[in-house]
């Protein structure tokens, strides 16, 4: 196993560890009839009364003055037992449907229809607040963080599978990272089944894979000399490489979105070790991927230089420069694509979350 493969295996282990931690934390802390993990966007009762006094016969100046005075008291924070929470009829719920929160964020609160009874106990309305929006942060972790971490892990595993298939059958630059075609899993299971059940040695698929090895060597030499030209002449190979690249960057972007736990409204109620673990996970994954990319690029450059020396001994410098420039160009395109995806995810994260997770 090469160094790059070891680093990617470590990235998989880190992703699995982070996912297990999130599932454990949600399962351990999900307690019914508990408001400690909920965040409420509230407005004081006096401000809400001012908003209710807006009438059609008021002047524009008066309406703006009342709206400006009533907009200030809106606050977002955890459940405060010194306050009386009254759920507004049009209060919105974040991250999960209402039926999953009835036993948690709605506990120890009153409905707007109970306002008359509440005002009898608290006639001054000083400690009464109206809930405009609320979120169950355990549901946030489960319906967003866990799903995102699972999707990132699955996409990264799919990338590793596609990458292994390419190194086994498709073009590659680093000759040290190629996989023998005879190690194809179908060849192994076919040979094993023939020996166990039919008591014979099945070698046809193995011979066919040896022929593929010869063809693959020719493809590798063409790919090493002119990478961009090879992709232009073989659009299917370009499509498969694009799928591999998309899976890779999509998994990295999905993994990086776990940092939202430090910036979303739920960050005020989630414990510090959850937020610190998210930073540690993203930093470790980023370090592993950077080291893996540097090592992989170094190997590809060395392999391309060796291939150019074998095939074109009279034009080594030109071949090496062409390969290095093509690789740098591809890396720049990959980096630009990643930056655009991250910017788009940050700008339209709410729409993306609504469409993907519901």
Swiss-Prot record:
Residues 34-141, 257-273, 345-358 are extracellular. Residues 163-235, 295-323 are cytoplasmic. Pfam families: Fusion_gly_K. The keyword Transmembrane applies. InterPro entries: GK (IPR002567). Interacts (via UL20 interaction region) with protein UL20 (via N-terminus); this interaction probably plays a role in the coordinate transport of protein UL20 and gK to the trans-Golgi network (TGN), and is required for the cell surface expression of gK. This is Envelope glycoprotein K. It comes from Psittacid herpesvirus 1 (isolate Amazon parrot/-/97-0001/1997) (PsHV-1).
């Amino acid at each position: 196993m090469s160094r790059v493969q070891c680093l990617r295996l470590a990235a998989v282990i880190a992703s699995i560890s982070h996912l297990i931690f999130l599932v454990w934390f949600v399962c351990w802390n999900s307690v019914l009839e508990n408001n400690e993990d909920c965040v409420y966007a509230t407005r004081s009762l006096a401000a809400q009364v001012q908003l209710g006094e807006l009438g059609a016969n008021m002047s524009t100046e008066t309406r703006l003055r009342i709206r400006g005075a009533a907009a200030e008291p809106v606050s977002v924070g955890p459940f405060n037992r010194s306050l009386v929470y009254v759920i507004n009829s049009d209060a919105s719920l974040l991250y999960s449907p209402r039926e999953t929160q009835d036993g948690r964020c709605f506990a120890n609160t009153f409905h707007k229809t109970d306002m008359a009874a509440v005002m009898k106990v608290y006639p001054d309305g000083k400690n009464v607040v109206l809930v405009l929006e609320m979120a169950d942060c355990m549901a946030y972790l489960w319906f967003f963080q866990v799903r995102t971490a699972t999707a990132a892990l699955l996409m990264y595993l799919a990338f590793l599978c596609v990458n292994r298939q390419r190194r086994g059958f498709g073009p590659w630059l680093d000759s040290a990272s190629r996989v023998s075609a005879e190690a194809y899993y179908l060849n192994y299971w076919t040979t094993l089944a023939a020996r166990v059940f039919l008591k014979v040695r099945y070698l046809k698929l193995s011979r066919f894979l040896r022929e593929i090895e010869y063809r693959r060597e020719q493809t590798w030499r063409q790919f090493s000399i002119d990478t961009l030209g090879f992709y232009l002449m073989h659009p299917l190979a370009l499509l498969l490489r694009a799928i591999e690249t998309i899976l890779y960057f999509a998994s990295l972007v999905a993994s990086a979105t776990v940092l939202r736990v430090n910036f979303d409204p739920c960050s005020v109620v989630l414990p510090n070790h959850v937020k610190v673990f998210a930073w540690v996970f993203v930093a470790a994954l980023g370090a592993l991927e950077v080291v893996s990319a540097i090592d992989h690029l170094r190997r590809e450059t060395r392999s391309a230089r060796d291939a150019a020396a074998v095939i074109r001994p009279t034009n080594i410098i030109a071949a090496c420069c062409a390969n290095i420039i093509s690789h740098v160009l591809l890396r720049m395109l990959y980096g630009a694509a990643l930056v655009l995806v991250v910017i788009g995810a940050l700008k339209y994260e709410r729409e993306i979350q609504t469409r993907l997770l519901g």
